[in-house]
Regions:
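A short, flexible loop at the N-terminus of ABC-type nucleotide-binding domains that lies
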Residues: 3-7, 16-29, 60-66, 83-86, ...
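Short catalytic/signature loops enriched in Gly
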Residues: 4-6, 145-148, 241-345
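P-loop NTP-binding/switch modules centered on Walker-like glycine-rich loops
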Residues: 45, 59-60, 180-184, 188, ...
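Conserved ABC transporter NBD signature motif
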Residues: 67-78
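Conserved ABC ATPase "signature" region
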Residues: 78, 130-149, 258
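ABC ATPase NBD coupling module
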Residues: 79-96, 122, 244-249, 279-284
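A short, proline-enriched helix->beta-strand linker immediately N-terminal to the Walker B motif
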Residues: 173-177
Length: 348
């Protein structure tokens, strides 16, 4: 039994979108928990449902979204049942979010200072002077030099990395307990990416935050996540501790993601995942990954696999784990990478 304190719990979360062509089944009955002080990474390709999951948590789904089923429990309250005016108590104050593109996350015609202090002045009994003082501390706290000057600048006057630091400061301005990071480094170059990841880790430790980190890149979460949920076609197909996912991956899709991580220490050819994700207007029968899976069996095209338990913390939805399935090893590139990580003593 896990004795850590659970801060958030999603149960059977199911989200669709109305379109002219029909209903797009974006998230299909997922379950996950978030514990106090941990980082949970949700990893998957574009269209896997990971960002829709993040927006469901924040109550900021598009107008054509439909929550078909499920619950999101925070401190015993089902966030999905709240009206918009009730959600204000939680959005920002309890749950903060860092978005993918810092430029589109900021108002281009509003000064940085106003964007930082706006929610403070609206939601708290605080003077403009105190709000500015807190904003300057936030800017300094996220590594922005000369915060007084930046306070009076517009977003276009800052670099991409600087803008993302401002977005992080805004997300922290109401002292949330949970920080949701939706691909926060995708729009940045590699050097700046590393700095932002380091900053998020430092803020998490300093503020004792719980973090949900959304990404398509397994390499990004290697040194960040405590646990990882791998999503494909709106479902969680593997779920475990970071060590379990990196050292004992069980789902062929997880193998494919690990094989596609660039490795600068070897001359291995960069692997790609064949085919494309399914059209979720017409969710496939059986295992959604089967058409792209070199290890697929006949049953994969007919029946959806359940989550098989490998350990108290590790689950994977693949028929390869059925007792009657043939024994299959991960591809050579994955097993060699695991051996290398173990030899180097690398922590996932």
């Amino acid at each position: 039994m896990d004795e850590r304190e659970k801060i958030l719990q999603a149960q059977n979360l199911t989200v669709s979108f109305r379109t002219n062509e029909g209903m797009v089944r974006a998230v299909r009955g997922i379950d996950f928990d978030l514990y106090k002080g941990e980082t949970l990474a949700i990893v998957g390709e574009s269209g896997s449902g990971k960002s829709v999951t993040a927006r469901s948590l924040m109550g900021i789904l598009a107008p054509n979204a439909v929550v078909d089923a499920g619950s999101i429990l925070y401190e015993g309250v089902d966030l999905l049942k709240l009206k918009e005016d009730q959600f204000h108590k939680y959005r920002g104050n309890k749950l903060g979010m860092i978005f993918q593109d810092p430029l589109s996350s900021l108002n281009p015609i509003m000064k940085i200072g106003k964007q930082l202090t706006e929610s403070m002045l609206l939601n708290e009994k605080i003077s403009k002077k105190d709000a500015k003082e807190r904003a300057l501390k936030l800017l300094a706290g996220v590594g922005i030099s000369d915060p007084e000057r930046r306070f009076n600048q517009y977003p276009f006057e800052l670099s991409g990395g600087m803008r993302q630091r401002v977005v992080i400061a805004i997300a922290l301005s109401a002292n949330p307990e949970i920080l949701i990071c939706d691909e926060p480094t995708t729009a940045l170059d590699v050097t700046i990416q590393a700095q932002i990841l380091e900053l998020i880790n430092a803020i998490k430790e300093e503020r004792r935050l719980s973090v949900i980190f959304i990404t398509h890149d397994m390499g990004v979460v290697a040194n960040m996540a405590d646990r990882i949920a791998v999503m494909y076609a709106g479902k969680i197909v593997e779920y475990g501790t970071a060590d379990e996912i990196f050292y004992q991956p069980a789902h062929p899709y997880t193998w494919a993601l690990l094989a596609s991580i660039p490795d600068l220490d070897t001359k291995e050819k960069l692997e790609s995942i064949p085919g494309t994700p399914p059209n979720m207007l017409f969710p496939p029968k059986g295992d959604a990954f089967a058409p792209r899976n070199a290890y697929a069996m006949a049953i994969d095209f007919e029946e959806e696999p359940p989550l098989f338990q490998l350990s108290p913390t590790h689950y994977a939805a693949t028929w390869l784990l059925h007792p009657n399935a043939p024994k299959v090893e991960p591809p050579k590139i994955v097993t060699e990478r695991i051996k290398r990580m173990r030899t180097l003593g690398g922590e996932a």
